[in-house]
Amino acid sequence: MKKPDIQQLKDIVNNSNQIVFFTGAGVSVASGIPDFRSMGGLYDEISKDGQSPEYLLSIDHLHDNKESFINFYHERLLIADKKPNIVHQWIAQLENQQKSLGVITQNIDGLHEDAGSHNIDELHGTLNRFYCINCYEEYSKSYFMTHHLKYCEKCGNVIRPDIVLYGEMLNQKTVFKALDKIQHADTLIVLGSSLVVQPAAGFVSEFKGDNLVIINRDATPYDHTASLVIHDDMTSVIEEIVNSNS
């Protein structure tokens, strides 16, 4: 990576006080969670089984066959042993230093929360929470995993993860909170997102602040509008920033 890019990123962060982070699947790769659509990712593995990923991750699957849906997310979605990496930790640290308004994420792995971030807008929900589809009793991930739950202890109906399935709308309260963050940000740092899947592109379009920074392995449609673009291994970039500040 180019040292001038690292220095420019440091300068932008040091001179900003209302940073908003927008994160995609690339942020969690170093935690052992492959991008859903990459080789070896969830979509790739499901497709090998001859199943449609979109159907298995849909509200229709839940309605059509509750037992199949339960077994699917127990076998494929639950990620008990994954830990936050240096990128999650850096984001949380800047929030704790009151340099950041928070993080908007497309990820469902809950690793921003695990790293210590508090002001998180999880656009697609989180696997850190579960609830009953009938009585809406809520269960934490730790309780859910420890007790190997499949059915609600209160009413006996199915428990589902608090994620947005295909066929469901995004939570509008979460969307409005995310948009408000971006509209008040002086710097928007995009990490590990291709910015091609909606609503990601729409959110970036709402940013009117001073610095748009994009750190992603591949090019995005917004690279030409950014103050700084780094196409490199994200973990290496953030390690360089953290080590230079220590």
UniProtKB/Swiss-Prot annotation:
It comes from the Bacteria. Keywords: Cytoplasm, Metal-binding, NAD, Transferase, Zinc. Its EC number is 2.3.1.286. NAD(+) binds at A25, F36, R37, Q106, I108, D109, H124, S193, S194, N216, D233. Its main location: cytoplasm. Transmembrane segments: none annotated. The active site is at H124 (proton acceptor). Zn(2+) binds at C132, C135, C152, C155. GO terms for cellular component: cytoplasm. Residues 1-246 form the Deacetylase sirtuin-type domain. Signal peptide: none annotated. Pfam families: SIR2. It catalyses: N(6)-acetyl-L-lysyl-[protein] + NAD(+) + H2O = 2''-O-acetyl-ADP-D-ribose + nicotinamide + L-lysyl-[protein]. It is found in: Cytoplasm. GO terms for molecular function: histone deacetylase activity, NAD-dependent; NAD+ binding; zinc ion binding. Its cofactor is Zn(2+). Binds 1 zinc ion per subunit. InterPro entries: DHS-like_NAD/FAD-binding_dom (IPR029035), NAD-dep_sirtuin_deacylases (IPR050134), Sirtuin (IPR003000), Sirtuin_cat_small_dom_sf (IPR026591), Sirtuin_class_U (IPR028628), Ssirtuin_cat_dom (IPR026590). Belongs to the sirtuin family. Class U subfamily. NAD-dependent protein deacetylase which modulates the activities of several enzymes which are inactive in their acetylated form. This is NAD-dependent protein deacetylase. The lineage of its organism: Bacteria, Bacillati, Bacillota, Bacilli, Bacillales. The gene is cobB.
